[in-house]
Structures are given as C-alpha cells and as structure tokens.
C-alpha cells in the first residue's frame, strides 16, 4: 500500500470506528482477494469514508473512482493522489481513461469502489438515481464480481446541503452488502450495459429501502419560501 494510504487509514479508521455507531450486514459477501467492484448509493459527503471503513473491515484496500474536483482541491488533493485513487474527468475526452485505470486495477486483483449515480442523489427522499454505465462496463469487461452496497445514516451527518457544522455529529451508520450480480461477462454491447445498469439501480433501491426503517432520516425539512 502507498504510504499516504496507510497514513490516511491510520488517522481515519480509529476516528470512524469510535465516533460513529456501525451496523454492517452481508460483509461476508465481499471477496477477500481478487478483482472486485463495490457499487454504493450516494446520499452524503461522508459516503466515501463509510465505504472505506467497510472495505477495511474485510482487510482490503480500496481504489475509488473519484471526480476530478477532489484532485484539484489543495486541502485534500495530496491525499487523494498519494493514496492511489482514480481520477474521473467527467465531460472531457479524458473521461474514458478512468475506466482504463480501473480495469487495470481489477486485473491486478484490486477492489474498486464506485458511486454509479455519479453524484449525491437529488431525490428528496434520497432514493438512488439511475446508475451511469461505468460499473456495468467494468463488470462486463473484467468478470469481476459487481456487488451493490446500500448506505444509510450518513445523510444525518454531512448531507448535501450541510452548512451549520464542519465537525460531524455522532450518528448511526448502516451498510447492507448485497449479492453479487449475474452479468453476461464478455458481452459489452449497448443492450448489455443498459440492462446491467438498470438492474444495479433496482438492486440499490431495494437495499436502501430495507435499511430505511433502521435509522430515522433526521435531515431538516427543506424550507419553502412564500411567493
């Protein structure tokens, strides 16, 4: 592992483990070795930290597909780059390079984590948005297990519109790991990509719905200004 990854892990893991109350279900479904794709729903800024915590619990390191803005933020760019994360330059000609890097990582037996929605969901009830094609493309090309994982509780900590606090409150976080999806490995046709992406969205929605009763959504209701 890169020294920067080990440094970040050494700082963040104890904090995450002691500050939040975790419920992890289905962890045994994550392979301990070999190329693996974990696909998470995205409801808050804390989600990558929660995903990394889950992966570390099974003794693996994680490579995230991360938006380029994180690599340009001087406060964290040195960590993101030094920890070997994969930059996604969305909307540019270089965007496909991210999948090439992820493909090589999977071929080398690494675990790659993705947020297939591409950004934090805009749904007011935090339902997953439609998955973009990246996760499906990787699974179809490499044959690596594509495993949907649902996050819940992080929306009470660092939600999309948080303004009042930078230090996160103590809260419960739950993660449900689903079953690896069956995909037609080697079929990289548009129909196959569309079908796998659709099924991934459906699986994430079902997993999230199963977690919702466990942790109340404590976000403040959005204020509607009078006309």
Give the positions of each predicted feature.
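Residue-level signal for beta-strand positions within conserved beta-sheet cores that form or flank
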Residues: 20, 60, 171-173
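Non-catalytic C-terminal accessory region of glycerolipid acyltransferases
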Residues: 3-4, 96-227
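Hydrophobic anchor at the start of a short beta-strand
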Residues: 22, 62, 112
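Catalytic core of membrane glycerolipid acyltransferases/transacylases, capturing the structured
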Residues: 17, 31-92
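Short phosphate-coordinating micro-motif centered on Lys-Gly-acidic
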Residues: 26
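Short, basic, glycine/proline-bearing loop/turn elements
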Residues: 12, 82-89, 118-122
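Short hydrophobic helices that act as membrane-entry/anchoring signals
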Residues: 2-20, 81
